[in-house]
Design a protein with these regions (language model features):
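Hydrophobic h-region of N-terminal signal peptides that target proteins for export
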Residues: 7-16
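Gly/Pro-enriched, hydrophobic low-complexity segments
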Residues: 16, 73, 84-86, 94-98, ...
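Bacterial N-terminal signal peptides that target proteins for export
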Residues: 1-6
Length: 249
């Protein structure tokens, strides 16, 4: 190998990864063709009153080209409430919600995606799966987060009307490209923080088993515990339609 090639490789090594490359690695690391889990949610309001909810989650496809159905299984008053999410590679998702008590489905308009999803601290937008190419990224530096070396990235949506958030900051674990924390801002004001913990390797995919979502203004938070998680299961596209939304699996 000649000296020019050695100098070129050295320059590439010194340059390191760009913010876009890091974000792409995060997405590629978590790629699977399907996913199923059961979730237990502890919703704590500003008075520390805790309400428990449970749901099931199923997905087919992968980032930017996937469909998912989230269905509440408890408590009894919201059992059967379900959300169909159709994610797209180049724009915000399409969403429909089924409410058994009303026996009707409703399309969730883009301007309503900032609303809380059935009393949790997740917004409808937070439940989407967006492709990395829908954002511009900037590397803010390297930081220790909970004694873990991380990259700190900034992301901004390319289509500003497609997101309630003007900017987000992400802490990404350098060892395995797992997101540990996301801070979401609206017009430079912190509105929502998501922490990811209990990281486990499941079917060769590093996966957070616990998510904590904090609504800063409401002073409330939701802790989601993921159980019975399986990737790459056999599912059919026909299970992810508005008709399927109306019927429990």
């Amino acid at each position: 190998m000649n000296r020019a090639c050695l100098l070129l490789f050295a320059a590439v090594a010194l340059r390191g990864q760009s913010a876009q490359e890091i974000a792409q690695r995060v997405q590629d690391r978590a790629r699977s063709q399907s996913e199923h889990y059961t979730g237990t949610l502890q919703v704590s309001d500003s008075n520390k009153k805790i309400t428990e909810k449970r749901w099931t989650f199923d997905r087919i496809g992968t980032h930017g080209d996937s469909k998912a159905i989230l269905r509440f299984t408890a408590p009894a008053e919201i059992k059967g409430v379900a959300l169909l999410i159709v994610n797209h590679p180049d724009r915000a998702s399409d969403q429909w919600m089924w409410t058994p008590a009303l026996e009707r489905d409703r399309r969730i308009a883009l301007q309503d995606r900032s609303a809380r999803f059935f009393g949790t601290d997740f917004s409808f937008e937070d439940l989407e799966e967006r492709d990395v190419d829908q954002f511009d990224y900037k590397l803010l530096g390297e930081e220790m987060y909970e004694e873990t070396p991380c990259w700190k990235l900034e992301s901004r949506p390319k289509q500003k009307k497609a997101s309630q958030y003007t900017v987000s900051q992400l802490w990404i674990r350098k060892e395995n490209y797992v997101i540990l924390r996301i801070d979401h801002y609206k017009k430079d004001k912190l509105t929502r923080r998501i922490n990811y913990s209990d990281i486990e390797k499941i079917q060769e995919i590093w996966t957070p088993r616990t998510l904590e979502v904090a609504d800063i203004a409401r002073k409330s938070r939701t802790v989601l515990r993921v159980d019975n998680l399986r990737y790459n299961t056999q599912v059919q596209d026909s299970e992810f339609t508005i008709e399927a939304l109306r019927h429990a699996r």
